[in-house]
């Protein structure tokens, strides 16, 4: 199993954000010692006219605006292809919650994915930070990248019914015939994407284009410099923006880092190893209870998990939902739960349902949440956007042997995710069959100007492993904040040590110590 898992935002961060961040001493907003590396901020490509927009009510994007009455929203038009600025345009949805006091500038946030909506994130975050120095001194701004969320055109490759059918297929048979089937499913998905969205749109959906979009949003805000907080995939976007538009960055925090120098296969293997670590942490916690469905013998945790989940390849598990629990949904639900200990109880409940032959519906709920399926059976486009962006962000090997070798390595580093035995064959990843060529290649991040960036990395982060943060901080020449925890991302999730360091940096440019380490 070599597919990448989407790097989702940690929604629980919004619950505690407002509790720790008030009352910090203030200084003038410019960052002391901020200098630019030679050549940074150069922007090749055809000239594009600065966007014009009007700020209006957010009801077009947000159903309930009662808690964000001061918020204003707009759409910013950007060229689908920046080499043809007068051609087809995409419209980016943007939300801005204005600072309540002396304004230091705009703080743009990106929740990750790729595919997650920053408009929705800001709408949820703003009420939680209403009484803090962040919203007192910064406009809180989110924009949905091209194809994502409330931006148009929305990238959709599947109907709701087609996505449901996709989830019912276990795609676990790695015999030659099974591999042929999986690759045919991937080819059909890729072709559906091209047929429904067009080759040109897919060729320009990548992070390189989104970084240019972000600068168009900066211009629409009227600011020469922005502040930026990127979670997960948002760190990749931040790094790309810094590389192209470094002179327009005042302060940037990258949490849950992606190493831009790593190949897709190596990134996938590293991520799978991270999920295995998180699984082990979950199982150890579960084993404190005699009712744990995985038992108390650590040597048997993986085997017991497979004994519960693998039979779903042949027959769905019981749920109150008539769909039942497929093998794919059980795996996806497990992955979702491993993003945060706050979700572990739902994983335990679902596994107990499988063990007892009763309702395993909590795993289905977790899978629906991950895949963006609502109670009416309608899907967000998060997953389609995730696939389309990652497939053009880096070239993926088409050689089947590379994926057989990857499957063998993944079975070693993440046995809980590996169905059956190694067969000597394995399907290529969706991106290896994607008809649109990659528009970027992996490369180390260039050193940032002094004081431009702070990197945060969590020791047992399943989706963006800790070492990626270490490596990105080294490439950028940036200080690293280490959080000792088992979760995906840490900033504004209630840890006083992390949050205070980040707040001081945004407010007055105070950099954390080079190797700051924060306990849970």
From Swiss-Prot:
Residue intervals of the AB hydrolase-1 domain: 105-403
Enzyme class, broadest EC rank: hydrolase
Membrane-spanning residues: 104-124
Cellular component terms per the entry's GO annotation: plasma membrane
Coiled coil: none
Name of the protein: Putative hydrolase Mb2247c
EC number(s) on file: 3.4.-.-
Signal sequence segment: 1-34
PANTHER family: 2-SUCCINYL-6-HYDROXY-2,4-CYCLOHEXADIENE-1-CARBOXYLATE SYNTHASE, TRIPEPTIDYL AMINOPEPTIDASE
Active site positions: 232, 461, 488
Subcellular location: Cell membrane
An MF annotation (GO) of this entry: hydrolase activity
Family from the record: Belongs to the peptidase S33 family.
Bilayer disposition of the protein: Single-pass membrane protein
InterPro entries to which the protein is assigned, alphabetical: AB_hydrolase_1, AB_hydrolase_fold, Serine_prot/Carboxylest_S33
Keywords (A to Z) from UniProt: Cell membrane, Hydrolase, Membrane, Signal, Transmembrane, Transmembrane helix
Pfam families listed in its UniProt record: Abhydrolase_1
């Amino acid at each position: 199993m070599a597919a990448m898992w989407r790097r989702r935002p940690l929604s629980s961060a919004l619950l505690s954000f407002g509790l720790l961040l008030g009352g910090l001493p203030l200084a003038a907003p410019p960052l002391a010692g901020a200098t630019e590396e030679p050549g940074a901020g150069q922007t090749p490509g055809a000239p594009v006219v600065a966007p014009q927009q009007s700020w209006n009510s957010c009801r077009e994007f947000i159903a309930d605006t009662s808690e964000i009455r001061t918020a204003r929203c707009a759409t910013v038009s950007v060229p689908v292809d920046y080499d043809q600025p007068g051609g087809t345009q995409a419209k980016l949805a943007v939300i801005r919650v204005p600072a309540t006091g002396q304004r230091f500038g705009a703080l743009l946030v990106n929740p990750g994915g790729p595919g997650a909506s920053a408009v929705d994130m800001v709408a949820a975050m703003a009420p939680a930070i209403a009484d803090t120095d962040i919203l007192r001194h910064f406009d809180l701004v989110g924009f949905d990248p091209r194809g994502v969320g409330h931006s148009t055109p929305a990238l959709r490759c599947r109907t709701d019914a087609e996505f449901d059918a996709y989830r019912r297929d276990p795609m676990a048979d790695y015999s030659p015939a099974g591999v042929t089937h999986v690759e045919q499913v991937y080819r059909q998905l890729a072709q559906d994407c091209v047929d429904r969205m067009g080759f040109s749109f897919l060729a320009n959906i990548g992070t390189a284009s989104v970084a240019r979009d972000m600068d168009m949003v900066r211009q629409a805000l009227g600011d020469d410099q922005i502040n930026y907080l990127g979670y997960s995939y948002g760190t990749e976007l931040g790094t790309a923006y810094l590389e192209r538009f470094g002179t327009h960055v005042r302060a940037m925090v990258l949490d849950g880092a992606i190493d831009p120098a790593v190949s897709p296969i190596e990134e996938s293997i590293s991520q799978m190893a991270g999920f295995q670590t998180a699984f082990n942490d979950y199982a150890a916690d579960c084993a404190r209870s005699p009712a744990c469905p995985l038992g108390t013998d650590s040597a048997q945790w993986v085997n017991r998990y497979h004994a519960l989940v693998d039979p779903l390849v042949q027959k769905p598990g019981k749920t109150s939902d008539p769909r039942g629990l497929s093998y794919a949904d059980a795996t996806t639900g497990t992955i979702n739960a491993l993003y945060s200990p706050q979700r572990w109880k739902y994983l335990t409940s679902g596994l107990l349902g499988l063990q007892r032959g009763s309702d395993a519906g909590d795993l289905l709920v977790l899978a629906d949440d991950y895949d963006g399926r609502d109670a009416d059976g309608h899907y967000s486009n998060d997953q389609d956007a995730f696939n389309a962006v990652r497939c053009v962000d880096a070239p993926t090997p088409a050689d089947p042997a590379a994926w057989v070798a990857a499957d063998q390595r993944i079975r070693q580093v993440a046995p809980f995710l590996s169905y059956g035995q190694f067969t000597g064959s394995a399907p290529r990843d969706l991106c290896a069959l994607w008809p649109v060529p990659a528009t970027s290649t992996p490369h180390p991040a260039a050193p940032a100007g002094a004081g431009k960036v702070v990197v945060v990395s969590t020791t047992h982060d399943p989706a963006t492993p800790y070492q990626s943060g270490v490596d990105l901080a080294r490439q950028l020449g940036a200080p690293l904040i280490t959080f000792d925890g088992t979760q995906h991302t840490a900033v504004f999730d209630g840890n006083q040590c992390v949050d205070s360091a980040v707040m001081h940096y945004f407010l007055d440019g105070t950099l954390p110590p080079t190797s700051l380490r924060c306990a849970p």
